[in-house]
Amino acid sequence: LIEWMRGSNIISIITYSKLEKDLPRVLRIIKKNKRFLFQRNLHTSFMKTISGTFTMENEPLDVRTYTNLVTNYLYNCNYINNDNRERLHVAIHELLMNAIEHGNCVISYDEKTAWLEERGNIIDLIREKNKLQTVRRKRVYFSYKITPRKSSFTIQDEGNGFNWKTYIDPASPTGRLELHGHGIRMAGFYASNVRYNSRGNQVSFDFLHNENEEVKIPQAFEKQKEIIFNNNQIVFREGEESNH
């Protein structure tokens, strides 16, 4: 299943127990950003550059959904291959989570460490923080600019910022990674030209596209046999059991 998913265009994975709660949220995101989804053909055929901004709530499910939305788009535009899609996914996901956790939710390194050691799930802490209206009303702004050569991204939260230099300096106590704290370095490893504003609540980075990359169909369907239908041929009837 994991290997099959590597080549798919999945926007979000929802467990059955959370289907009733999470599916409407994912569908709202897709509906809200349908213009972005339908820009693919226009972009590859007519437009050289597209840009925009996603406004996100402090919800980890949204992070996964928006990350897949962007990386799948670039993959389907033939701008990145599957390996680079995974690298970009890591960079975007880690920096968006940092914006929510440490920016809007003001979760300190020590607080996160204690929570992970005791309970093991940072998502529960984020949702606990969001019970406060002052936290819940904050937003993360995820901006993009996509050109044929590269994609540029900016992520800005409404928090107080942080001293980002200490987290990329290996000699700094906070630079020595322990139970967590890998996000900034991982993003810097996979993306290029990672830069912060002086306040530390905004990060920008670039991701170079593959040259002459061609992705005709999703990898998950590469081994599927092509089926050609004739005009007026009946493909299936209502109530018939699927063979897939």
Q: Across the structure, where does each feature detected by a protein language model lie?
A:
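Regulatory nucleotide-sensing modules
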Residues: 227-244
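Conserved beta-strand-loop-beta-strand hairpin that lines the nucleotide-binding pocket
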Residues: 43-51, 100-228
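CheY-like receiver
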Residues: 21, 34-62
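Non-catalytic regulatory/interaction regions at protein termini and inter-domain linkers
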Residues: 1-11, 123-125, 147, 232
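Conserved polar catalytic motif of the HATPase_c/GHKL fold
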Residues: 94, 98
